[in-house]
Structures are given as C-alpha cells and as structure tokens.
Amino acid sequence: MLRREEVERIKEQYPKGTPIRLYSMEGEQTVPPGSRGVVDHVDDIGQIHMKWENGSSLALNVEEDRF
C-alpha cells in the first residue's frame, strides 16, 4: 500500500484531465494496450480513475500498470 505522501504526489502529478496512454495493465484486460484516456480522479489509495476512449472507467494501479 502506498504511503499518504506518495498518494498526494500522484494526485499532484495526475490532475483531472491529464491524458494517459496505456502500455500494459495487470489483471483485468478490458483496456487494450495502446489505449488512450484522461484522468477522472485519483482516489485515497492512489489509484488513477480513468475515462478510456473505449468507454471503460477502469482505474490504473501505479504499482502494477505501465502507462
């Protein structure tokens, strides 16, 4: 689990509307590699909730996913 300081850094680095391209995602594969999306928000455990171009809203895990 991320420390509070790490979560705050992620929130500062990825504000709402930040564009992101996915390279790989662990676990669920509803978002294919190469997909683009924008940040909706970062939650209190540091997951980046997205609005993906394919309509998915699956969150990114900064410790496991590559983007």
What are these regions (language model features)?
Residues 1-67:
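Basic/aromatic-rich interaction segments and small domains that mediate binding to polyanionic partners
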